[in-house]
Structures are given as C-alpha cells and as structure tokens.
A protein has these predicted regions:
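Alpha-helical transmembrane segments of multi-pass membrane proteins, especially transporters
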Residues: 6-13, 65-74, 136
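Functional transmembrane-helix hotspots
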Residues: 81-109
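Cytoplasmic membrane-interface segments at the C-terminal ends of transmembrane helices
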Residues: 50-66, 148-161
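Transmembrane alpha-helical insertion/packing segments
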Residues: 1-55
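Hydrophobic alpha-helical transmembrane segments
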Residues: 109-144
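Cytosolic juxtamembrane helix and N-cap/initiation of the first transmembrane helix
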Residues: 1-13, 144-160
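Alpha-helical transmembrane segments of multipass membrane proteins
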Residues: 13, 17-21, 45, 77-81, ...
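Loop-to-transmembrane helix junctions at the membrane interface
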Residues: 56-80, 84
Length: 161
C-alpha cells in the first residue's frame, strides 16, 4: 500500500466512522459508551487497519511497511474522526453535557476557572487530541503488523506491478 493509498483509505474510514458516530449521537444522544458499544465501533476500525497491513504485504516483504501502513491509515482516520467529534461536541453541547460519561468533565469544568463550558470542552478535546492520535497510530501499527503477518504466513502475498 502506497502512502497515498493509505491516506485515502484513512480519509474514507474517517468519514465512514464519523458518520456512524454522528448517526449514533442523533439516535441516542445520551447513550453511554459501554464496553459493547465501544467494541462494536472500534472493532471494525481496527480490522480495517489490519487490512491496510495485509494490502501492504502484497507489495513488499518488509513487515515494517505493513506496520507503517496501518499506522498511517489509523492516523488519518483519527484526524478526521477527532475533527468531527470536536465539531459534534460544539454543535450539540447542550445535550452532550448531559451524557453520563461527561459527568467527570462537568465536575472538572466547575473547578477549572473557565467561564465557558464550550471553551473548556474545546480545551479538553484539543489538548487530549495528540495523545489520542498517538494511541490510535500505535494501535494501527500493531493491527497493520498483524494483518501483514497473517498475509505472509498464509501465503496471500502476491507481488503487484
């Protein structure tokens, strides 16, 4: 998988998962992020990152390239998703602030010294974004590595071009 293909794949995944996030927020705006809901959301995402590694292994025997493909796809996916989540929080702040998983954020806001919940929420989301991008890229690298290894181990590697 070329870098351009990885970026495009990440953009598509970011758009798909962002739409899923927005639809879920519209259908059940106060739903908690339960372990089952998180698995249902992130499981397919991680599988797609593994596919990036698998596709990369079809072009090269270097397993590091599979991890790089997974990491790049994950980074771009999460850049898009993070931007959409921040926009969603801003557009739906009144309802989002009532979510059970926001109660800790609301307690921290009250003692933060910020005069605006919107400003505080943006501060929290923007300062947390680099760590989330790092974690997503690391998980993407691992998924890409696993996808590449599975392809190589089961002989699915076919040179392209």
């Amino acid at each position: 998988m070329t870098n351009l293909a990885a970026i495009l794949f990440g953009l598509v995944l970011g758009a798909v998962f962002s739409i899923a996030n927005l639809v879920a927020s519209r259908i059940a705006p106060l739903a908690e992020d339960t372990p089952g809901a998180l698995l249902l959301f992130y499981g397919p995402m991680f599988a797609a990152w593994a596919v990036a590694g698998l596709m990369s292994s079809r072009r090269t025997t270097r397993i590091g390239d599979c991890a790089k493909a997974g990491a790049l796809v994950a980074l771009v996916t999460f850049l898009v998703l993070t931007a959409v989540v921040i926009a969603r929080v801003n557009f739906l702040l009144d309802i989002t602030s009532q979510r059970p998983d926001w109660q800790n954020l609301m307690v921290r806001y009250r003692s933060s010294g910020f005069s605006s919940l919107r400003a505080y929420a943006n501060y929290v989301y923007f300062t947390g974004a680099p760590f989330k991008l790092l974690v997503a890229s690391s998980i993407g690298a691992l998924c890409g590595l696993l996808g590449g290894c599975s392809s190589i181990l089961w002989g699915a590697r076919r040179p392209v071009g």
